[in-house]
A protein has these predicted regions:
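Solvent-exposed, amphipathic alpha-helical segments
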Residues: 6-21
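A general structural-boundary detector
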Residues: 1, 17, 42-45, 92
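A solvent-exposed, acidic/Ser-Thr-rich amphipathic alpha-helical stretch
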Residues: 4, 8, 24-82
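A beta-strand edge to alpha-helix "cap/lid" segment located at domain peripheries
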Residues: 3, 60-132
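Hydrophobic pocket/interface hotspot
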Residues: 14, 26, 30-31, 38, ...
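Alpha-helix boundary/capping and short turn/kink residues
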Residues: 20-24, 95
Length: 132
């Protein structure tokens, strides 16, 4: 497979695991998809601990806040020397709004080590009781 094909497959796995409800399965996928020293920059302001475990907990909190959702690539995935950028759309719409965004990822040795996320039109509800 080409670098582009590998990147497309990795982006698909990355987006899909944000919908995985089973904690053990999600953490296993996170450990396969993201590098050990993974870094995420995102705009929600929700708690985000370091590394893969921090991402796992962050996704769990988002699922509590937003319910069932999936992400789909919207358009082409542009790749260049271990970097990729693409737009995405969240399904179903949240609170009547179609939530969209764009991400830039850096991949080293087949794993995502850096993710920069921009989210459009998302207003988060109050955190659930017991949420971090």
């Amino acid at each position: 497979m080409s670098e582009r094909d590998d990147m497309i497959a990795l982006v698909s796995r990355h987006l899909a695991l944000w919908s995985v409800k089973d904690d053990d399965l999600r953490l296993s996928e996170i450990n396969d998809v993201y590098g050990e020293e993974f870094e995420l920059i995102e705009p929600t302001g929700l708690p985000l601990g370091p590394g893969r475990l921090g991402l796992h907990e962050h996704i769990g909190l988002l699922q509590k806040l937003l319910g069932d959702f999936t992400f789909e690539v919207d358009g082409d995935i542009e790749t260049h020397h271990g970097w990729a950028t693409y737009a995405w759309v969240q399904r179903p719409p949240y609170n009547g709004r179609t939530v969209t965004g764009r991400e830039v990822i850096h991949v080293v040795d087949g794993r995502i080590v850096f993710l920069f996320m921009v989210i459009h039109d998302l207003e988060l509800p109050e955190r659930p009781a017991g949420g971090a």
